[in-house]
Amino acid sequence: MPPKKKKVTGLIKLQIQAGAATTAPPVGPALGQHGVNIMEFCK
């Protein structure tokens, strides 16, 4: 059985180059304050 979908609680728009996402500002704090797992996103 597939995992249950999570409800969307917010929308974050970021313009970053492909493969350039890091945990450093401004990307890390922007994701962190919305509860996004930063390391999972940057993978």
From Swiss-Prot:
SUPFAM superfamilies noted in UniProt: Ribosomal L11/L12e N-terminal domain
Family annotation (InterPro entries)? Ribosomal_uL11_N (IPR020784), Ribosomal_uL11_N_sf (IPR036796)
Membrane-crossing ranges are: none
Keyword RNA-binding carried by entry: yes
Q: Which UniProt keywords apply?
A: Methylation, Ribonucleoprotein, Ribosomal protein, RNA-binding, rRNA-binding
Q: Name one Pfam family in it.
A: Ribosomal_L11_N
Q: Does the keyword RNA-binding apply?
A: yes
One GO term in the molecular function aspect is: rRNA binding
User: What are the annotated disulfide bridges?
Assistant: none
Q: Where is the signal peptide?
A: none
**What's the domain of life for this entry?**
Bacteria
Q: How is it modified after translation?
A: One or more lysine residues are methylated.
Its cellular-component GO annotations read: ribonucleoprotein complex; ribosome
Q: How does it assemble?
A: Part of the ribosomal stalk of the 50S ribosomal subunit. Interacts with L10 and the large rRNA to form the base of the stalk. L10 forms an elongated spine to which L12 dimers bind in a sequential fashion forming a multimeric L10(L12)X complex.
Which family does this protein fall into? Belongs to the universal ribosomal protein uL11 family.
Its biological function?
Forms part of the ribosomal stalk which helps the ribosome interact with GTP-bound translation factors.
What is the official name of this protein in its record? Large ribosomal subunit protein uL11
